[in-house]
Amino acid sequence: MKYCLRMAVEGALTELFNIHGLNLQNQCVQIIQQWKNENYLGMVQSGSLMIEEFHDNAFALLLFIEIRAVALLEAVVEHLENRLQFDLAVIFHQHSGGDRCHLRDLRIQILADRLD
């Protein structure tokens, strides 16, 4: 089954990462690539990523994935959300000298794959 996973990122968060010399888009792409390469329990059969840029440094990640079974969708989304939030928090903490940032608003929205 194919799905489009969309995660919107506010420009303020992008700026916060920029202040500490980090490119948030690149960090997200690297985390998603690592996540896909690990392929937790072999759930994801294929995937591709696109970034939709908006004004004021806001953007949305669009991840088109094919999973083995519909029943796995919630587990895939939860695992990816947790991975992004945790890894971004650690990266920010390391590069900011110990500061923390609020990442709980980074949620993935499930859409039907519009490429079908």
From Swiss-Prot:
Gene3D superfamilies: Mastadenovirus E4 ORF3. Keywords: Early protein. This is Probable early E4 11 kDa protein. It comes from the Viruses. It holds the Pfam family Adeno_E4_ORF3.
